[in-house]
Amino acid sequence: LPVKNLIKELEKLGTNLHDIVVVSDDRGQKYLENLNINIYITKAYSSQNGILGYLLNFPKLIRSIKEIRKFLRNKNISVVFTTGAYIAPIAAVISVLLNAKFYIQEQNVYAGLGNKVSAIIAKSIFSSFEDTKNINEKKVIHTGPIVNTSLTRKDILLHEKQTIGFIGGSQGSEQINQYVDEFMKSELHTDFNIVHVAGKNKTNLEIDSNNYESFDFIEEMDDFYKKIDILVGRAGGGSLEAAYLGIPQILIPYKYGTTSSHQPLNAKYLEDKGYGFIVNTFEDLTIKINEISKGFKSGKSNLPNITIGNLMISKELYEQIV
């Protein structure tokens, strides 16, 4: 969770954690429970259908803004920072009502509509990717992603029997799950260990093999990253964390719905920079797995380093609150 990693950096700079308030939903709360900060849980309305969703549910939007403003108005808020495009319009309005500076972190190559609209109010937009599109370029500062720095490349060790991690994002991926099923039926699977994050509410695969373990969801990604040598997954904003750790990725970008704009562009960026490979078929997947595996054995698996934004973003926010 980017905000958790950012809070840790702010604390290192000298920020009193009691001066930080996080507005989140139930899903985000569980990631922040071990931090000594104020957390306000809300079911604030956020549109997943663009501007139309906000227009059709305008009363819900107003209620959410009033609710959050009521909680924050006596807390002397000087900075509002958001990492989520869906909630960005509410955060933008709240910043105006509280007379606070507003910052956005854009986690994809192609900015979502929520961040694009909210950028009108933002002082700055911190981008994870270079050349971020669909947003006010004059306000964009390329910082790199916010990642978990408790792990570094030195902590990612090559296993005697290489391990492939399959993950389809927080909600899982039917396509990736299907590829796992096919892979476990192939002769190739015996050469690897498999860690599969199937996603909640996804159909569990009936795989009985000593080299296969499956999870609905993983809360501590550190454990997952330390287990794997190759990552097969989507191309969301989190793919930059694997790049930071030097884990080669096989990318299967989602091409439908709200992620259809940014995931293919994210994947192309990662491939162009040498952090991963895009595949479109199961056959392509097996070819790339073999290529990467042979690269490990020949010592040709070093990935280029990636710039991260933890410190740069934290310093900018810290300067505004001291």
Regions found by a protein language model. Name each.
Residues 1-197, 201-322:
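Nucleotide-activated sugar donor-binding and catalytic core shared by glycosyltransferases
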